[in-house]
Amino acid sequence: MDKKKLFQYTLDGKFTDLELTLVDSNDTLTMHLHKVILSSSCPYFETMFSNSFSDSVSDKFRMEVINVYVMADIINSFYITDIERSQNLSEVDYQLLYTQSRNFLGLEHKIQNLEKIIFPENKFDKLLDTIDSCIGYNKETISILFYNMPMDYDLSKLPIKLLKKMSKISRYFILCIDSDRIELHNNHSCFSIGPVKLNYNCKLYKLLYSPIYHKYLMVNDTIHLIDTETDLSRISFDNNRYYCTNAVLSTDNRYVYSVYTNSTIRKFQTETTELIGVWYRDGMPIDTVNKNQGPITAFDDRPKKIMYSTPYDYIIVQYGTSLVCYKCLDMSIHWEMDNVHLPTLSQCEKYIVCLKGITGNQLCVIDIEKDSLKFGPILANCRYICNHDNTTVIIIHDYKISGSKIRVYDWVNNIFTYENESFNVSDITYIDHIENDNYIIVSHDIIDDSYISINKWNFKEDTTKLVTACYDNYSHKFYTITNFKAALQKRIKEYIDTNSN
């Protein structure tokens, strides 16, 4: 059966056996259709044309619907897949009506259509009503609700049972680039944020999220900004000769500081992406018009990491094995330090925990304000140092023969408080702390190196739970953690604690 030819017959009014008139509160639309196509594609029409109802259905039928044009699109999709929308609605309004209309017809729901949309605050109640009346609450729909819920939403509108499920299901998100788009994953949904401009010659990307301005930023040879409320994007710094190796937001989210392959530091406004200033490694300013000038930096001395210290308004940049601390006020150098490896900013942002020495094997704590050192134990085969809480870090050792060891180090009291030797870290490409004893790890499959898995890992229980997985077809992909719903999570938890019996 050639459905495309049959669809053309519906347009021409030829060889059809049903005249279906769709009626809503504003419009009426008549379609000439084939009963066999409708009944084979849709439970609603299959029941209508069954023996028990066939006597009441003639060759003409009037059907009251929510929106005649959206319903017509769904019916036309029974014939062809590449249909053009018959009404000029916003994507938000269209998908809500589309979901409601499919539910009316008894068709399966296409939840992925809702995941692709950022719902504005004034549409959240409609989203909630649509999910409540049409789909129901499951892990995917609760995740969609949490993702789109306004920060100041009246939580009393939602039952405690639903809020408890919401607090359990959506604790963290992973931001990544996939097929020229920015996507946000949690363990139940994949939300499409928007398209990005990729330079495939550039292997270095940094993804940031500003919870204050509700914007995503992708920093490479350009600055690509996406507004989550309007879904509009802006690109700055075109034709930049050098690539960003790392970037960080100031605590107030007003500025982004980024470091580039020519060892320059750049500062720009988050809200407008306007370039504020460019500085050499020694803190000397560069004319922003000539921002691409600068010395060619040896690969081993290029900037690797940039950290922001909130209490002191400093940025600390790692160049090769050197650390340089700058005052954000005037970008003057506060201190410099050599032979530093694996620097990690403490949770209180007043200290840096790292490895020190020419061989890079002695644990050391740097007081950022006082430029003082506190030395700890000698370590062997240290692979990662990860911030854990205000006084401890996770240290991961990689032993080629005997496997791996996880240790928790209390740098205030200079003692190890925990050890675990069962986890294999040899294939980890990224690790970051989420909460309590839980971390996110990104790793390549041992057999198929192109296969990437992102897992939630509890280091004390030595358990992992898959969050998402994909094939890394391009080396430019980068993953990071963004807990941009932390404030809402806190509100929900406080509301549950206050209102639970």
Swiss-Prot record:
Coiled-coil stretches are none
Listed as disulfide-bonded, the cysteine pairs are: none
Domain named BTB: residues: 16-87
Query: Which is an annotated Pfam family here?
Result: BTB
| UniProt cross-references to PROSITE patterns, sorted A to Z | BTB
Matching SUPFAM superfamilies: DPP6 N-terminal domain-like, POZ domain
**What highest taxon heads this organism's lineage?**
Viruses
Protein family:
Belongs to the mimivirus BTB/WD family.
Its protein name is Putative BTB/POZ domain-containing protein L107
- Record organism: Acanthamoeba polyphaga mimivirus
